[in-house]
Amino acid sequence: MDKLFWIGFVGAVVAGLFAVLQAKKVMGYSEGTEKMQKLAASIREGANAYLKRQYTTVLKVFAIVFVVLLVIAFASGGKMLSKFTPFAFITGGIWSMLAGLVGMKIATSSNARTAQAASESLNKGLRVAFSSGSVMGFTVVGLGMLDITIWFFLLRYAFGIDDPVQLGNIMVMNGMGASFMALFARVGGGIYTKAADVGADLVGKVEAGIPEDDPRNPATIADNVGDNVGDVAGMGADLYESYVGSILATFALSAVGGYGFAGMLLPMALAVVGIICSIIGSFLVKTKENASQQALLKSLRTGTYTAAILAAVLAAPLCFLLLGKAGWGVYVAILCGLIGGCAIGYFTEYYTSDTYKPTQELAAASETGSATIIIGGISLGLKSTLTSILIVAAAVLISYFAAGGSKTIVDGAGHFTEAFNKGLYGIGIAGVGMLSTLGITLATDAYGPVADNAGGIAEMAGLPEEVRERTDALDSLGNTTAATGKGFAIGSASLTALALLVSYVNIVQDNTEEILNFTLTSPTVLVGLFIGAMLTFVFSAFTMSAVQRAAQSIVVEVRRQFKEIPGIMEYKADPDYAQCVSLCTQGALHEMVAPALLAIIVPLVTGLILGPTGVVGLLGGVSVTGFAMAVFMSNAGGAWDNAKKYIEGGHHGGKGSEQHKAAVVGDTVGDPFKDTSGPSLNILIKLCSTVSIVFSGLILAFHLI
């Protein structure tokens, strides 16, 4: 059975080839006028410069962590930490970095091409931007499959590890590098993009009264660079980590659940099927000229829903062939993941799209000023957690019992029963099911920043108003699809985090003869819960204040240029775009390290003081509060953004009105919500889990309590 894992290579090759074909297709389109090409080159140059400095900084941190892991692994003779983990940490980080880099390269080559295509038709603009997003989506899933398959064959055949439990426990540790890189990319990119966005909007729109992406705004280029480093490179690393993490967590649970190599093969096979279904669905994304937002949403839904339905149909024979009769219960769990993912996507769309009542009512709140629209957005975000949490709760319960879980959790020796582990395997495979069609889901997400950049280039290049109207329609759709993509990532993170938590407990129990109390009656578990809950809020505070400080420097700089460079407002002098790009780069690199290190230091210190039971409490606390906070922030931010777009479309006074200025203030509050703190939380949840698993041996050996 284990020899069938070569299908992972097949999935990687298919995804890679499709990504290359889509990239060639995009590069075949015209990049527009000379001015459009120069603007695109400036954005590309700024994005490349930032990523070069970010990766240089991150690699230094990676080197330090690698040495620490290496010392622990070899000094303990592999007892505290597998000798493979330090090297898997490096490869996971490199693949995650590469996923973001490839996505950003194609995005910065597609923005002007999308603007030029939009000058011809709305459908052509949609196709170019979506094809660019497809490169990102299929690169992520292809690299993920390649990484997992290479490590499986190395461990199984090169090093002769034939025990599924041992192999699964080693493999689950491999996700730490990807999670670590993803957190740096998301936090750093999020700080950059939102500092530029907030600074550009507050001074440009509110104070100077000039349109979005106006060439007179010194922060315009930095804003467009930020779309790429945060919403493309950061998101690519983020979802690569989510994809790989969900599969690896299921690997570990398959072994202890008694499914062996067959249970490990299932998530791989499901991922390959998802790649093929995503390719089919991508060909169905198209629209008519002058399409409404509802019609544009329908075009993307057609592709994503078709892929999900095909994956659901093909998953049934996979489950039966690999797991026999037990496969039918696992199939129900996969359906829970697929349906849950689509349901989260729908309700995210409902709360954030301006075609629905919640965002329209939020836009109406601008009639009474910025305070009421901010209050309304917070209320909307808080309310939106209800549906997401209920969907995930239902998916957890149904998948657990369908896969063979029971109410009896532990046996007489205090270890988890096989039935409990089978149920947890069901929850893990539900997470894989939710992300199985990530190729097309991520394509619809990565398309958004490209459309946003295209609108900026159209404005700065002085293209006709009808072109800007088309790019605005695509941009507004992108805001909704971005929120939907974040919903998928957050939902899958909650399922994966639960699977990783149980993997941690299993690994701890396998390495100690002590009977540990992991229930709420343990004071260390309770204290850990409080620390985990606190970590969510402190981490969010770190990322929000980082954006605040970086945005303040941009606001001061833009005001200075308007004041000290005569002729900017009359188009007689060019702003100093490079200075704003430099400030954003410095701010993001300086501010991203502290939040990222929290995810490593807090679980490790908690474990060394409170022991393994305290870590379980921490993981439970950060998972629950982090999930709810991430949904709240992402949906509130998306709604504020689209409420502003709704007003710019001619409602409630339109562009330049007092209502519009109030909506811009709401949007600037929502920017770090939806693009920095919110999406970073789902990485925090999983990184805490993988860090705890990696350092479980050290914690067992040296804890105080």
Where are these regions (language model features)?
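Hydrophobic packing and interface segments
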Residues: M1-I705
